[in-house]
A protein has these predicted regions:
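Alpha4 helix (beta4-alpha4-beta5 surface) of REC/receiver domains from two-component response regulators
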Residues: 51, 95, 109, 120-135, ...
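Acidic catalytic/metal-coordinating carboxylates
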Residues: 66-69, 92-98
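Conserved acidic carboxylate
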Residues: 41
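Charged docking surfaces used in two-component/phosphorelay signaling
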Residues: 48-56
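The feature encodes the CheY-like receiver
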Residues: 89, 121, 140
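Active-site beta3 strand of CheY-like receiver
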Residues: 77-83, 88
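Short hydrophobic/Thr-rich beta-strand motif most characteristic of the beta2 strand and flanking loop
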Residues: 58-65, 73
């Protein structure tokens, strides 16, 4: 699993460590403001798992099960982060990402996007970077790896 980030990597400011079944993962002490995460994932069980885990960590989470609904939700709520699958119905993840990055609304352009997908080829990873994803993770993934990327993208969460 390879991850790339356009943004700076940040340390574990104000975080404590909590043991989990997977690995030791950082947990926020007292969030100053809950961060909003939008999950755009067509697999219900994957979306539900992510929603549950992220809510337990103090995030406000909403989910969309296709690209068109996800894009609409993003424009209406302006989340702090989007976790986006590439292979979703109605509007592929690549198009959702490109549409947000090419928007005239600066708030939409600046939303960090983590691609979380089963597409593991080097071409797909390069495409993710070219269209503006902040990170690219492949399925299957370890939740603690995803959480580490989230904390680096949203250091104040």
């Amino acid at each position: 699993m390879r991850v790339f980030l356009k943004r700076s990597w940040y340390g574990n400011r104000g975080l404590e460590m909590k043991a989990s079944a997977e690995k030791v993962i950082p947990v926020e002490k007292t969030p100053s403001k809950k961060k909003r995460i939008l999950i755009i994932e067509d697999e219900y069980s994957a979306s539900k798992f992510l929603t549950m885990r992220l809510k337990n960590l103090g995030f406000m989470v909403s989910a969309a099960f296709d690209g068109m609904t996800g894009l609409k939700e993003a424009t209406e709520t302006i989340p702090d982060l989007i976790i986006l699958d590439l292979m979703i119905p109605k509007l592929p993840g690549e198009e959702v990402c490109k549409t947000l990055r090419e928007s005239f609304d600066e708030k939409l352009v600046r939303i960090p996007i983590i691609m979380l997908t089963g597409k593991d080829s080097m071409v797909d990873k390069i495409l993710g970077k070219v269209i503006g994803a902040d990170a690219y993770l492949t399925k299957p993934y370890d939740f603690s790896d995803l959480f580490e990327v989230i904390k680096k993208i949203l250091p104040d969460a």
